[in-house]
């Protein structure tokens, strides 16, 4: 394989960046909802401007009220966010209310950055008038011309006069990014709400809605910002509970789902639940996908050819120490030609022919992969009356990533920045594999390695079933599978694709944040399909920033087409890395 350049910013990658950012935004609001912060600008408590639960569900996939201005407190964090509008959403809405005891004069201006693609956005209220003292929702029609596919920036400017004699005027700017498709005519019917589960969620009674109270200023210093996020994440995590069939909450739960019933407590004290499966997709992405290949598709002739090319003499391999041992599998540290440090995978003498064949087949999965983030096989030794050796390069004390994370002395020294760096390295490696039509099918920390410089590499899954037996389960079909890492379509129909790899990568990121805890530890493997269909997903780890959790949660969208590609994941991880290192 040749290295692939992933630095280009395609339109679909930008789609992902803004789409991922919207979920980062909403989840960070959920984490901060319990705090009554007053560090933002104020407008004398005369005004509310917010998105109602229906609008938030349509655009952001969460049942909540998101305030831009609440009782005069301006949420600059929300105002600075550009909300993407999917192609199937034909209008956007806002809700406002005057709290001054009288109508507040206003003026509205809506601007499209491309009149050819998105002409004349029309609002259903006057461009100038008075904000009523009762709650009112108004909307802006965003009907694309269908002449070409593009992303169009829509800027909504709202000017509110609080006190004309004192020249007290508030200016608010709301930004949207509308996705327009070719032949997407203005007459197309809207598909805003067509999911029964989404409909059920949107039509919750008011007592079951989450009200977000946020007044965070983006201009806060780095120390305050980091401390605030850490405090809020810890507080939210301590309150996170799982309600099963109306029973008592399980405080040790590692998963969560959307709460579709009114909570017993107020929204400020109840757990915040999330179902990524109902996130509306961005329909502007059209990345071509190659036909995937996997271990099962390797022909015997191809396997023989690869082994022939990689054959090394057994006498050149020296084993120095045993790193891992299973029922039949072994992993050693050693040297090749007395100069090159290597990892050696092999099997015991009592291993069956099938186990030997599986070692060779899975060991060849990443054959020829030339990428700094991939641990490709270096050589194979097969000699009569001996078990095979599969060699991998192992500079700088390379070891298994899951074992590294399970070692308390190592795991507690890993920072959030380093976790993001690891995830970014692996996303680039997987983007490289997918660009060559290779689907990994078993992405997890057990199938990665790490060196002393915390550089991580993706490896194949050979011997993993034997070395990490608790990570695999047999569901009555005589096949050990990584059930807790698998997407719903992989569980139900054994359908593996780039999208199922994306799902597993989300679980891998969760492992990185939890020191390789077992995902869905409380769930019986036979119940996983049921739990995923019901919307349950892994809960946010205690030490995981909201933005990072949003990236992993987006990988768990129910429909494969709604999950991000690894090029998109890399873009989002790079953006988050820039954010968290800006003040360091």
Curated annotation (Swiss-Prot):
Protein kinase domain segment(s): 317-577
Upper taxonomic lineage: Eukaryota, Metazoa, Ecdysozoa, Arthropoda, Hexapoda
GO cellular component, as recorded: plasma membrane; receptor complex
Protein name, per record: Tyrosine-protein kinase Dnt
Broad EC category: transferase
Encoding gene, per UniProt annotation: dnt
Cytoplasmic topological domain: 230-584
Ranges of compositional bias, category Polar residues: 250-261
EC number: 2.7.10.1
Species of origin: Drosophila melanogaster (Fruit fly)
BP-aspect Gene Ontology terms: axon guidance; axonogenesis; cell surface receptor protein tyrosine kinase signaling pathway; determination of muscle attachment site; muscle attachment; positive regulation of neuron projection development; positive regulation of phosphatidylinositol 3-kinase/protein kinase B signal transduction; salivary gland morphogenesis
Signal peptide: 1-40
